[in-house]
Amino acid sequence: MMKLFVVTSLKEYLGDISKIFNQANIRVFSTVDIIGYKQGTPNNLLDDWFASGEEDVDSMMIFSFTSEEGADHGMELIIGYNKRIKGNFPVRAFVLPVEKSV
């Protein structure tokens, strides 16, 4: 089944994320510049998604329509990558099922 594999990271990690996509056999992907904000809001599910504190962060969203195997391998590689990097900005990733497409 086709999946949508989505990764968000700091712009400086884009080269590493490109290598991860390649290792996961994901050869075609798109990128979008994003700026993540976190303000003093009540607790919610996104509290730990962006940086702590009230700053903005230059980030990238990298995504691809890929096989389930590619998405699963990509997630495993992201988990390993996060264990190796230092800092407060881990790479985030998620997978969504693609039920229909035209």
What is each of the regions a protein language model found here?
Residues M1-V102:
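Positively charged, small/polar-rich N-terminal and surface patches that mediate targeting and assembly
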